[in-house]
Amino acid sequence: MMLNKIMVFLILHMVIPIVVGTFPGKSKPSDLHEQEIELRLKQLNKPAIKSIHSPDGDIIDCVWIYDQPAFDHPLFKNHTIQFHGSKSRISIWKPNVLRTREFSLAQTWVVNGDWDTGLNTLESGWQILHALYGDKNPRLFAYWTGDTYRETGCYNLDCPGFVQVSRHISLGAALNTFSTYNGEQYDFLLTIEKDQETGLWWLKFETYLIGYWPSFIVPKLAASARKIAWGGEIVYYTSGRGTHTLTQMGSGHFAEKGFRKAAYFNSLEYIDTSNYPITPSPQNLEATVTRPECYNLQVGSSQRWGTYFFYGGPGRNPHCP
């Protein structure tokens, strides 16, 4: 039976007053995602160069959101905004993922370049991806590519690239405490930040330095990033009968459920070229949701959480058949 792959994602555009748009070289974000996910899934069969085994397994879920989606507007062709990283606190959940090669995730992106001439990205968060880990637990992950997901790049330590330095936190490790509906909530602070002296891009989990990406593997990120992103995404397969998947995003509940019921990102910050963290205003954020009847998001701000958003959904439901 022929199965068709379908992607659903949430995109939160950060509109710093210089640029608003789509990814360079693409008419809409879904064009990039469609090809990107296909190429990433093809890389799952690559042999591992090195692996670190965690005593409690592996876990992670991911969500997409885009900050500075593009520089396509003709009024802004000669303007550039530079970023040295991203910070956010991401809640951990264990959504239902239906099939082996389907996934649900929450993540942050650091991006430069474009699809046609070579997209360079550094990505990290949590995901559930049975095809990679052999189970349906949420796991901490990292990913990189220096050529639009074509030949270079991989998850975690599955190829040369990311350099692990921590003996306490392993990429691919299971996140064995996760949030429950109306119960305890668990999250973690994730930071990707460029060291101005060495040029290394460091990945930090809470206060632990996990490791780094050397800039030579992502040459377009050697100086800075042009886009920062946070968000959520699922990929699912259909037999063509037209029904939506039961694969969940986030907690499996809609954003309006709020705290203890919906998944969230809070304490959103981007890092400027002085390596100073800046909190974006909710007024400078625009959301793109491909299937709002299946998954949605709500943005807000508070003194305790800074700029934040709730997101997610159950997938198939009476309004999303």
Q: Which role fits each region the language model picked out?
A:
Residues 2-321:
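Exposed, interaction-prone regions of secreted/extracellular proteins
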